[in-house]
Amino acid sequence: MIKQISQAISTFFTEHESVMKNFFSMSFMKGLEYIAPLILIPYLVRTLGIATFGTMQSVVSYMYIFYMLTNYGFSYSAARQISVHRDNKEKIQQIASSVMVLKILFMIASFVLMIIGVIIFPHLNAEFGLCLLTFGFVAGDVLLPVWLYQGYEKLHILSRFQIFSRVLIFAFTLLLIKTPEDYLLYPIIYYGIQCIAGIASLLLVPKLFGVHFIMP
């Protein structure tokens, strides 16, 4: 009985290896998004002070509005379309190009709305520079084509970018942020590295999938 169960489990994992690898990679990436900042929080609170750290977190919360706007369900709908048409390169190219153009347009609109909000609300206006730098959170998400890698069931490749970027963020944060005056360095480090990882993952798309981004 135990042997039969073991064989059944082994067969299931063999037949669905790609799907399972994709699932665990997605879970791992999501876990990193939450765990990595938590590791750094004690250090940042101690180095920057509770008030400054609280201000930084309130700005991040503000950016979540624009993060939701630029996502607009692409993570699921686009990934599903990529998966369905993965053998049709021309169709994939149209879908991928359209999604990237839309996300960039939404990002531009979000940036304009963000600036308007910063101008209107005094507590945000007082941290204009911090708001501009923290918008990198939105830009980094737009540049990282999770939906494309997910559609091709290649999230394990993207997870390597995430691991490497988190290691760099952790290292540079500890090396460069030493006083409360260094608080602007954190969004530069964190979101700058995220944007670079996103660009690198986009540059790999033609090589990995044979897909080129074109104007739709």
Language-model features: locations:
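N-terminal membrane topogenesis motif
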Residues: M1-A36
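C-terminal transmembrane helix end/exit motif
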Residues: M1-Q7, E15, A78, L144-H156, ...
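Transmembrane-helix boundary and interhelical linker motifs in polytopic inner-membrane proteins
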Residues: F13-E17, L48-T52, F66-V101, Q150-H156
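Alpha-helical transmembrane segments of multi-pass membrane transporters/permeases
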Residues: N22-L32, E90, L132, G136, ...
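Small-residue-rich midsections of specific transmembrane alpha-helices
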Residues: I35-A36, L40, Q57-S83, V142-V146, ...
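Interfacial/gating helices of multi-pass transporter permease domains
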Residues: I41-F66, Y183-I188
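Alpha-helical transmembrane segments of multi-pass membrane proteins
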Residues: I65, I104-I108, I115-I119, H123-L148, ...
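Hydrophobic alpha-helical transmembrane segments
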Residues: F128, L132-F135, S159-F209
